[in-house]
Amino acid sequence: MEKRIRALKAIILVAVMVVELFGVDAVRVVAETFKVTENTTISKEDDRDYAVTDCTLTVSSTGNITGTVYGSGGKIVNQGSINRIERNIEVDNQVGATIQDLQSSVGITNAGHIISATYSSISTLTNSGTIDTLNVNNPGFSDSAATVNMNAGTISSLNVMNYTGLNPI
């Protein structure tokens, strides 16, 4: 019993030290991020952050994620609204759907509305919807020119960040 009490005291001490070192927000981010490892559908308003790993997260037309979705492989199918998407995840933003801020390094398909998107030029973006601001990062590798397939969509503002001096588009 005494070993269990000592172990519990050690865990509490570590938690206190983490809070003192990084602040309450660091603990809150880790504690409030919901890990998704199998296909999941969100159909209501949700303020949690999601970490998606090698599966599909679907946000239905009644779904609204006000937090951030972090990708590590896998795919997001958005039919509703998502505040922010970051990292390595494929995105399918469907008709009537909205994404406020998209930072992705994998293929993007947009038929809805994206307020702001930043993507790596080694990926393909297919747009038949509306993108208010598109930022393209060209890493400067050979054959790293951006591919933007436009079916019937609009891009209001296009910004290209080129790290080699070459014209990436």
Regions found by a protein language model. Give the residues of each.
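Bacterial N-terminal signal peptides that target proteins for export
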Residues: M1-I12
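Bacterial N-terminal signal peptides
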Residues: I11-G23
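Extended beta-solenoid/beta-helix repeat architectures
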Residues: A31-I169
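Intrinsically disordered, low-complexity regions enriched in serine, threonine, proline
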Residues: M1-K3, D25, R84
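Sec-dependent signal peptide cleavage junction
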Residues: L21-T33
